A protein has these predicted regions:
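Positively charged n-region of N-terminal signal peptides that target proteins for export
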Residues: 1-4
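C-terminal motif of bacterial Sec signal peptides marking the signal peptidase cleavage site
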Residues: 15-18
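Tryptophan-anchored aromatic micro-motifs
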Residues: 23-38
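Short beta-strand segments that buttress and anchor functional surface loops
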Residues: 29-32, 49-50, 75-81, 101
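N-terminal glycine/threonine-rich, aromatic-flanked beta-hairpin/loop signature
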Residues: 35-75
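A structural detector for short beta-strand units
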Residues: 37-39, 58-60, 84-88, 110-113
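Edge beta-strand at a domain terminus
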Residues: 58-66, 102-126
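Structured, soluble extracytoplasmic/luminal domains of envelope-associated proteins
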Residues: 78-106
Length: 126
């Protein structure tokens, strides 16, 4: 019985850790929307904050629900507490400091960079 309890506890721990966000996208990002609006996004393990250029912040709870790697391009799926889903996509296999946040239909919402505010076109520059 003791072995079963320890095994179940270990499995539960792995599941709970698996729901928190990846180290790849945790931390601060400079984000630009399709209209050129500038935002600061900060990802923590289980929530993220979006701050607009006037300083207004909104905080969202999320869980990471998928990781997909295709042709060395990594996409993380996250689901917000209210049920909405988003993808955090890093289209350049050798550069995880530039990316896109897309809605459930794959439409880009923000371009993200660790250093600068960038446009959509900048993500795909060679």
């Amino acid at each position: 019985m003791k072995k079963i309890s320890i095994t179940l506890l270990a499995i539960l721990s792995v599941i709970l850790v698996g729901c928190s966000g990846s180290d790849t996208y945790r931390g601060s990002w400079k984000a630009t929307d399709s209209k050129g609006g500038k935002f600061e996004i900060f990802f923590d393990a289980k929530n993220f904050t979006v701050k607009n250029s006037s300083g207004k912040s909104e905080k969202y709870d999320y869980t990471q629900n998928s990781v997909e790697i295709e042709n060395s391009v990594t996409t993380y799926g996250i689901q917000l507490g209210d049920g909405r889903g988003y993808q955090i996509n890093f289209p350049n296999a050798d550069n995880e400091t530039l990316g896109l946040i897309k809605d459930e239909n794959g439409n880009p919402i923000y371009t993200i960079s660790r250093k600068d505010y960038i446009k959509y076109e900048d993500v795909y520059k060679l």
